[in-house]
Structures are given as structure tokens and as C-alpha cells.
């Protein structure tokens, strides 16, 4: 199975960002990390193995773009002013929209995009998908926190 690591300096964020690409074809799946997780956690947790998502990746049904985050600089940056945290989240959204989506389309022309995440990644998947319905066809949120201010769990 194809595994590739990519890193570039993000103009939207003003810093280097990393991601991991798994698979060779299929629906493009944006995989958001859990709370303070990383781009490698889905492979670290063997989600790409047979019996989990391995067959889907091997058969070209999905291609996963495992993303990194800016949690400490946004919602988890409790030392920051709330407005600064919200602004950083919007910059992350711009990074996804203006950099990750075009990058993934350059790797794989399949127009079908799925945003998926677990825990705080589910919040990011839902947020990005709902904010960009013209770019995202499906959202899968697993055990996510959807109301950060009220800390309500769904």
C-alpha cells in the first residue's frame, strides 16, 4: 500500500505543516487528528491494516489524507485570548480549503471528499464540512465534541 509523507510551509498558517497520504485512489478522505493527536495517529493505531481500512485502501476505494492540527494555537491554547484562538481556527480552515484540498486533488482527481475525525477531530471534520459544503460530500464524526464553549458532548 502506498504511504507518503509530505511537509510544506503553509502561507495560511505561517508555519510548516505535515500530513500523511495512505492509498493510491478512491474517495479523498481528510482525516482529522484527535485532541492533540498527530497526522500519524491513524497508522500508529493500525487503522490502515487489514480488517480495519486496509482493504479499502488496497482496492482504491479510499485515499486518506491524515492531517496535523494547530490545537495548541487555537482552541486548546487556553493562555490565548478567545478571539485569537478563534482567528487561528479560521486560519486553519483557510489552510485546509486553500492548500490541503488542492494538494489532495493534485494527488487524486476523485471529486468525492469525506471529512472524518474522532474526538476533537470530529469537531474539525464537522466544522470544515459544514463550512465548505461545496468541497465536502460527507462528514463522519466519531465521538466528537461539537460545542466547545458549552462543552456539550454528542
Predicted regions and their residues:
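Non-catalytic cap/lid and distal C-terminal segments of serine-dependent acyl enzymes
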Residues: 1-153
Amino acid at each position: 500500500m502506498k504511504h507518503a509523507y509530505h511537509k510544506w510551509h503553509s502561507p495560511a498558517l505561517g508555519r510548516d505543516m505535515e500530513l500523511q497520504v495512505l492509498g493510491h485512489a478512491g474517495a479523498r478522505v481528510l482525516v482529522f487528528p484527535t485532541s492533540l493527536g498527530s497526522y500519524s495517529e491513524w497508522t500508529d493505531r493500525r487503522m490502515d491494516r487489514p480488517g480495519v481500512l486496509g482493504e479499502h485502501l488496497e482496492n482504491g476505494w479510499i485515499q486518506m489524507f491524515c492531517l496535523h492540527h494547530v490545537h495548541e494555537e487555537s482552541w486548546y491554547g487556553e493562555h490565548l485570548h478567545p478571539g485569537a484562538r478563534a482567528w487561528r481556527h479560521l486560519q486553519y480552515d483557510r489552510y485546509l480549503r486553500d492548500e490541503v484540498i488542492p494538494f489532495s486533488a493534485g494527488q487524486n482527481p476523485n471529486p468525492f471528499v469525506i471529512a472524518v475525525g474522532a474526538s476533537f477531530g470530529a469537531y474539525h471534520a464537522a466544522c470544515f464540512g459544514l463550512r465548505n459544503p461545496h468541497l465536502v460530500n460527507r462528514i463522519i464524526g466519531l465521538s466528537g465534541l461539537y460545542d466547545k464553549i458549552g462543552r456539550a458532548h454528542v
